[in-house]
Swiss-Prot record:
Protein name: Recombination protein RecR
Toprim domain span: 80-175
CDD domains hit by this protein: TOPRIM_recR (cd01025)
Gene3D superfamilies, alphabetized: 3.40.1360.10, RecR Domain 1 (1.10.8.420)
Keywords: DNA damage, DNA recombination, DNA repair, Metal-binding, Zinc, Zinc-finger
Disulphides: none
GO process annotations (BP): DNA recombination; DNA repair
Length: 199
């Protein structure tokens, strides 16, 4: 089947999305093109809308329509507890569990020699400033259970030693090598409830 370069380019772009290969990308493109006046235009309009409206929260790093996200500005959140997550995907996963009512701090990365991510790329100075300014009582390290996530967790623990907050880690239930975004809500809820002091 010969496809135009524009279609090939669209298939290529979709195939770069997480979890999609070239076959799935081709199916998506065909689905969109079969009713492009409705499906494709709706997708385009939504993407343009998101591009214009979505910003990174100035406090935690979440993505929202406001400079200070709904979580950080909520009066119903426990402002004495911060969960440190690697990316917004993990923040959203914890929110889906419905079990965590504190605040978040998105690092943006984990420490990884392979991908050349180093401590200076993490948002740790901002975290320490938040901990002191908001009188944080507990910091929950909610990094993934991968080697990089564990390394990042240990580094954060050392970094926060000068702050008196209790430092805890999500409990078992998260498999070694597992990523929060792929866990079901029940497993993540149990991990939040059974979190343990970080040693």
């Amino acid at each position: 089947m010969n496809e135009t370069n524009d279609i090939d380019q669209l298939i290529y772009l979709f195939s770069k999305l997480p979890g999609l290969g070239s076959r799935s990308a081709r199916r998506i493109v065909l689905y969109l093109l079969q009713d492009k006046d409705v499906r494709l235009k709706s997708l385009i309009n939504n993407l343009i809308n998101i591009d214009k409206k979505i910003v990174k929260c100035e406090i935690c790093g979440n993505m929202d329509t406001e400079n200070i996200c709904r979580i950080c500005s909520s009066e119903y959140r426990d402002k004495s507890v911060i969960a440190i997550v690697e990316t917004v995907a993990e923040l959203w996963a914890m929110e889906r569990s419905g079990n965590f009512k504190g605040l978040y701090h998105v690092l943006g990365y984990n420490l990884s020699a392979a991908s050349r991510k180093n401590p200076s790329m993490l948002r740790l100075p901002e975290l320490l400033t938040r901990c002191f300014a908001a009188n944080i009582k507990e910091v929950i390290i909610a990094t993934n259970s991968t080697l990089e996530g564990q390394t990042t967790a240990y580094f954060i623990t050392e970094y926060l030693k000068e702050h008196p907050a209790k430092i805890s880690r999500l409990a078992s239930g998260i498999p070694i090598g597992g990523e929060l975004d792929y866990l079901d809500e029940g497993t993540l809820s149990a991990a939040i409830n059974l979190r343990q002091p970080f040693e």
